[in-house]
């Protein structure tokens, strides 16, 4: 493909992206010598600091994928599925506001029927789906999305006492950490590298990091030269 065609493709993709947030999509996925698989998802958002990256929630999967939908070579036959999705209104706006920024215990049921509690932090409501919340966990710092209002009312989510909701900062505020590269050392001594791409408005010490070659976003509390999370 000529450089001119590449430039045109990037320009067209950028223009299209502004119109597909909140839309359902389908595409094929081909990685290496693995068989081609088929996927359907909803586009939740664009990353404010890098609009070519999309927050994508695939059907039946709770973790959030962050992908360059129009330039990732593994994505084939990308289609926007009509019509645009209509989302339900939040029934308890007060509870929704109270959850954001809070540390919580989230109860899950294992395949064998036993229960386990995971400690996490509610980061934000999903902008286009207010009944869906971004959340991350101490044992797994990836970004997830769940319908937490239902879980709370069913007794499967509890706000941890003495952790008041954080005061949301302005989205216009800038932060010197955004755009910086970070180095992460695993328990086995190997390293991976990533970039700080976003500061969580409700928790100013919490940041999203996109590691090189990874299709997920990871959530860390950052202080100078330290990532305050359990190493994976």
Swiss-Prot record:
The lineage of its organism: Eukaryota, Metazoa, Chordata, Craniata, Vertebrata. InterPro entries: SPIN/Ssty, SPIN/Ssty_sf. It holds the Pfam family Spin-Ssty. Transmembrane segments: none annotated. This is Y-linked testis-specific protein 1. Belongs to the SPIN/STSY family. It comes from Mus musculus. One of its GO terms (biological process) is gamete generation. Expressed in testis (at protein level). The gene is Ssty1.
């Amino acid at each position: 493909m000529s450089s001119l065609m590449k430039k045109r493709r990037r320009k067209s993709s950028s223009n299209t992206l502004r119109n597909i947030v909140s839309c359902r999509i389908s595409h094929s996925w081909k990685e290496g010598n693995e068989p081609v698989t088929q996927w359907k998802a909803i586009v939740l958002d664009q990353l404010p600091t890098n609009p070519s990256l999309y927050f994508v929630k695939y059907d039946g999967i709770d973790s959030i994928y962050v992908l360059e939908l129009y330039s990732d070579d593994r994505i084939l036959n990308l289609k926007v599925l009509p019509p645009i999705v209509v989302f339900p209104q939040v029934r308890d706006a007060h509870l929704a506001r109270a959850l954001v920024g809070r540390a919580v215990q989230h109860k899950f049921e294992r395949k064998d029927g036993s229960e386990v509690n995971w400690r996490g932090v509610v980061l934000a409501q999903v902008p286009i789906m207010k009944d869906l919340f971004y959340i991350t966990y101490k044992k797994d710092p990836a970004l997830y999305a769940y319908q937490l209002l239902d879980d709370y009312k069913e007794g499967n989510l509890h706000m941890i006492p003495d952790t008041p909701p954080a005061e949301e900062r302005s989205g216009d505020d800038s932060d010197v950490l955004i755009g910086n590269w970070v180095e992460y050392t695993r328990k086995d001594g190997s390293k991976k590298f990533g970039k700080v791409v976003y500061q969580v408005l409700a928790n100013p010490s919490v940041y999203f990091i996109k590691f090189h070659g990874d299709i997920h976003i990871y959530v860390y509390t950052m202080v100078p030269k330290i990532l305050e999370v359990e190493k994976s």
